């Protein structure tokens, strides 16, 4: 073996040790883990489609259209959530729906009572106001009422009391009406989420939206 061959073999085996920057082989390139691109992409596209439908359909000026947008948003949220979170929200939502419906029935009873109070207060206020107006037109009625001081005071007191009750009951009924609308919207959202969480990919659903009422109906 010649000296040139020996030198070439030596440089081949020991060249990396004499290099200024030693050669480091690259790490082994592992294959990427499989992703759920198909199913996740399909769910995201469905969620975006539902949100686009909710945002671009109408302006949502009325309460019914606002409730419809809330239902669309709940369904989009159900399609976007992972399966474990979806099932947890479904079971919690079913429990919450019972309490919300009980609260809604209680608020409707209070609202009905307030409407009766408003009607009766309005009738008494109108009657006492008419009695006070007749005293201005007819002098005989004015003299009769002036002679009976307790009757005049009673009429004015009833007028003041019923007017105050009318204003107070009107404000309270407006607040209860807002709470009723907000509660009905929450019920519609949770029922839509439960329906979407129970929906199969074929479009069937095991929990149907029954007795969902929007707006003031």
Swiss-Prot record:
Short name of one Pfam family: Orbi_NS3
Highest taxon listed in the record's lineage: Viruses
Stored InterPro entries: Orbi_NS3 (IPR002565)
Homology family: Belongs to the orbivirus NS3 family.
Physiological role: May play a role in the release of virions from infected cells.
Protein name, as recorded: Non-structural protein NS3
Organism field: African horse sickness virus
């Amino acid at each position: 073996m010649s000296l040139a061959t020996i030198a070439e073999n030596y440089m081949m085996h020991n060249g990396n040790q004499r290099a200024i920057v030693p050669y480091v082989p690259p790490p082994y390139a592992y294959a990427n883990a499989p992703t759920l691109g198909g199913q996740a992409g399909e769910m995201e596209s469905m969620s975006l489609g539902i949100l686009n439908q909710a945002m671009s359909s109408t302006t949502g000026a009325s309460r019914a259209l606002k409730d419809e947008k809330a239902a669309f948003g709940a369904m989009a949220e159900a399609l976007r959530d992972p399966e474990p979170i979806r099932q947890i929200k479904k079971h919690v939502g079913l429990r919450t729906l019972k309490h919300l419906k009980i609260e809604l029935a209680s608020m409707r009873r209070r609202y009905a009572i307030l409407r009766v109070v408003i009607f009766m207060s309005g009738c008494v206020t109108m009657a006492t106001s008419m009695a006070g107006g007749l005293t201005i037109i007819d002098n005989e009625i004015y003299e009769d009422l002036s002679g009976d001081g307790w009757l005049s005071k009673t009429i004015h007191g009833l007028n003041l009391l019923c007017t105050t009750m009318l204003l107070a009951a009107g404000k309270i009924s407006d607040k209860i009406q807002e709470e009723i609308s907000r509660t009905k919207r929450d019920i519609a959202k949770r029922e839509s989420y439960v329906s979407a969480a129970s929906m199969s990919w074929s479009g069937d659903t095991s929990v149907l939206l029954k007795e969902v009422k929007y707006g003031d109906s």
